[in-house]
């Protein structure tokens, strides 16, 4: 998921 790239 895009927000899991943090």
From Swiss-Prot:
**Name the UniProt record assigns to this protein:** Tryptophyllin-T2-7
Q: Which residues carry this modification: Leucine amide?
A: 6
- Kindly list the places in or outside the cell where this protein is found, as annotated in its UniProt entry: Secreted
In terms of domain of life, where is this protein from?
Answer: Eukaryota
Can you list the GO cellular component terms from the UniProt entry? extracellular region
One GO-annotated biological process of the protein: defense response
Say which family it is in: Belongs to the frog skin active peptide (FSAP) family. Tryptophillin subfamily.
């Amino acid at each position: 998921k895009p927000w899991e790239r943090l």
